[in-house]
């Protein structure tokens, strides 16, 4: 007679034997062997095809995985690959502006309001940059330009005795590089700009202005790679007849300024500085804007990589022009025109769907659809005061070479 305990032991042994047979069959299966051999993604594929496509904020978290990952993600080769993917990826926040207000720096992803108007989560909203604080309430702070995720701004002016200093900053990575005034004796900053030269793999900072006890305009360029200033040109009084050029508009690796001639204030012209060969050149304006029609002002802007120019006429109509082919000055084309709302100051950005970001005198930012007549406005930010904006893309590019 078999005892119950012996029957249980025999049944358990039989089950274990059957289970081992099935396990061996699974392991020895050619299909399972193939799947098992590809269970882990090659690390090269992870870095070249996966991590390069992630938003930079997510990428920062992956740097904490290990010292090896941190080192590889920080290499110039990976950063360039990530930058290329970021600019070409429509799902990564690209339509952003970096804002200087009287008290703080901000980042606004205005493109999210156009892509997902009913979504109240995600990347929407005004994000304050907490890593930088003003010591003078921003009175003497001015934006100089932005390129590939790096923002260039300066501080100085009459209140500081015209002592200037400049900064190249990645607000997402919280990396900053300080640049001193080339001579320390600028009397007044007339023009400035910031851009990237691909053939030299270098970022250049341009400043031009009057020096103390001199009527000449001096123009200097700073190389972020060599960390040196170079004097580019000295203009005699009246040779570069400008009242104030401000920050240059970067298109085709060339900085552009709309200039007011000193001796004839009503006459406007466009000046370009080629960052590649470091020479000044004249850019022809749209012929339609050179007629007798009275206008209140003409300004330049960047329209998704093309040079744009807009003009406000006395009747309140705004016309936007775009240079379709750079260098072919007869390719200026009228993009749109519509009646502008009171208090309009500047165009700040463009979405993929053709909507424009507008700035008003009180520091409000609105998204407008110029294709509708009258134009439809969507208020994004209200009453920031006296602000400046530059287009901005979130990248892992470092200002420290």
Model-derived regions, located:
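N-terminal entry/capping and adjacent linker segments that precede and initiate structured domains
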Residues: 1-401
């Amino acid at each position: 007679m078999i005892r119950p305990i012996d029957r249980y032991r025999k049944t358990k042994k039989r089950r274990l034997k059957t289970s081992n047979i099935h396990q061996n069959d699974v392991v020895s299966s050619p299909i399972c062997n193939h799947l098992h051999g590809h269970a882990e993604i090659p690390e090269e594929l992870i870095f070249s095809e996966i991590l390069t496509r992630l938003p930079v904020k997510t990428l920062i978290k992956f740097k904490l995985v290990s010292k090896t990952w941190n080192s590889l993600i920080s290499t110039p080769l990976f950063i360039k690959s990530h930058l290329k993917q970021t600019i070409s990826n429509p799902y990564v926040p690209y339509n952003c502006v970096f804002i200087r207000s009287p008290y703080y720096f901000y980042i606004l992803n205005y493109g999210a309001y156009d892509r997902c108007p009913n979504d109240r989560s995600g990347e929407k909203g005004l994000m304050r940059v907490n890593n930088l604080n003003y010591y003078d309430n921003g009175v003497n702070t001015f934006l100089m330009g932005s390129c590939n995720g790096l923002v260039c701004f300066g501080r100085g002016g009459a209140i500081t005795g015209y002592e200037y200093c400049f900064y190249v900053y990645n607000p997402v990575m919280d990396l900053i590089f300080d640049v001193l005034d080339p001579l320390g004796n600028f009397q007044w900053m007339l023009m400035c700009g910031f851009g990237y030269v691909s053939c030299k793999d270098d970022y250049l900072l341009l400043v031009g202005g009057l020096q103390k006890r001199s009527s000449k305009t001096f123009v200097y360029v700073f190389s972020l790679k060599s960390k040196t200033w170079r004097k580019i040109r000295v203009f005699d009084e009246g040779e570069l007849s400008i009242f104030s050029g401000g920050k240059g508009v970067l298109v085709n690796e060339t900085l552009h300024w709309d200039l007011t001639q000193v001796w004839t204030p009503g006459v406007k012209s466009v000046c370009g500085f080629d960052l590649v060969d470091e020479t000044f050149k004249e850019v022809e304006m749209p012929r339609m804007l050179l007629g007798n029609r009275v206008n209140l002002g003409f300004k330049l802007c960047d329209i998704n990589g093309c040079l744009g120019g807009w003009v406000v006429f006395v009747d309140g109509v705004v016309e936007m022009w775009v240079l379709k082919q750079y260098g072919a000055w007869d390719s200026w084309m009228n993009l749109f025109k519509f009646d502008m709302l009171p208090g309009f100051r500047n165009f700040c950005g463009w979405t993929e769907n053709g909507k424009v970001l507008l700035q008003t005198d009180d520091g409000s930012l609105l998204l407008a659809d110029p294709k509708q007549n009258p134009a439809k406005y969507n208020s994004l930010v209200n009453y920031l005061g006296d602000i400046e904006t530059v287009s901005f893309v979130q990248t892992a590019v470092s200002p420290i070479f």
